[in-house]
Amino acid sequence: MFLAIEDERNPMHIGNVSVFEGPPPTYGDFVRTVAANLPLVPRYRQRVRFVPMELGRPVWVDDAHFQILYHIRRTAIPQPGSAEELRNLAGRVFAQNLDRGKPLWELWMVEGLEAGRWALISKVHHCMVDGVSGTDLLTVLLDREPKPPPTRAPDWRPAEEPSDLHLLADAAADAILDPFNRVRGLPIVRV
């Protein structure tokens, strides 16, 4: 649903700005930490695949060309690194739609905040998390439970992407079964 109502002027992503005390981790360490935690949120390596001719609901497929460095960006705001400058940057980041040809998330590591602080700007499409109960990458990264730092990301191999024919066959099966699912959800009325 959130994909269907999104357009250029109405992005459907959820944004978050988190500010941290102290110096930031190195960009390389941060990327390695995110990569090591991606197995906990497999959706973050998947992209949306649309059924040909829009005959069915979009499906999630592993992104065979996943590049973590596309999703984790690093930037700095100009001195003095005020909250207003951070808000302006976040506004520019949030104003841009996510690329639907890739997994629908971005993390921006922001350096240069006043008082030696740094920030993380997170942007995730609403179809991936609901903002309340959905597990997202930021939740995993900011877990308060002590754990050893990840050493390296486990090897990952994307699943084979379904063919157009497979997607159309699944859409046809859903169309046949869907009336039964709709009826099953109706209330029983006794006269």
Give short role names for the model-derived ranges.
Residues 6-11, 15-191:
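Soluble acyl-CoA-dependent acyltransferase catalytic core bearing the H(X)4D motif
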